[in-house]
Regions:
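Catalytic centers of hydrolytic enzymes
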Residues: 1-164
Length: 164
């Protein structure tokens, strides 16, 4: 799953979470989209997002990925990136020469997939997607929380590292 930081408008306090709080944190109603992105498109999106470190007015800010781990400098440079599989195994990605042919399946929202904030080319308009779903990430988040039926621990898992 990929999103940009500007889609998140708050945080969860410790304690019970209800759907109203989910909708406050992620208030934008965007349908989920499944598509394939090349390694190069992923690297380019993270590089563009990292530029917000040198220009605070630069939208969209950093990219928040699931399945990717990366290091950026406060000068806006992408230093390292790797793909992390479901078992936690990391595979390095060459950020200086990413593959234009190696593809990753990504779930994101239609704003991001449509080139919103200029991080990606418009994959929706060009019909370069696998599926557009008739629900948004708020519903997915609520469904996930309900399915857990137990407290959820939110912790820093080290996916994004910022260095001087």
């Amino acid at each position: 799953f990929n999103t940009n930081i500007n889609n998140i408008r708050g945080f969860f306090e410790a304690g019970p979470v209800d759907s109203r709080q989910v909708f406050e944190v992620v208030p934008l109603k965007n349908n989920m989209v499944k598509l394939k992105l090349s390694e190069k498109e992923l690297v380019d999106a993270v590089k563009k997002g990292a530029k917000s470190f040198i220009d605070s007015g630069n939208k969209p800010g950093i990219v928040i990925p699931s399945g990717l781990k990366y290091t950026v400098s406060r000068q806006g440079e992408l230093k390292a990136m790797s793909f992390v599989d479901k078992n936690g195994k990391e595979t390095p990605i060459d950020v200086n020469n990413p593959s234009a042919t190696k593809l990753y399946t990504v779930a994101t929202d239609d704003f991001f997939a449509s080139g919103g904030d200029n991080l990606l080319p418009n994959k929706v308009q060009s019909k370069e997607y696998d599926e557009i779903f008739d629900f948004d990430k708020d519903k997915l988040t609520c469904d996930y929380i309900k399915k857990q039926n137990a407290p959820i621990e939110i912790k820093d898992d080290g996916r994004i590292t910022i260095v001087d």
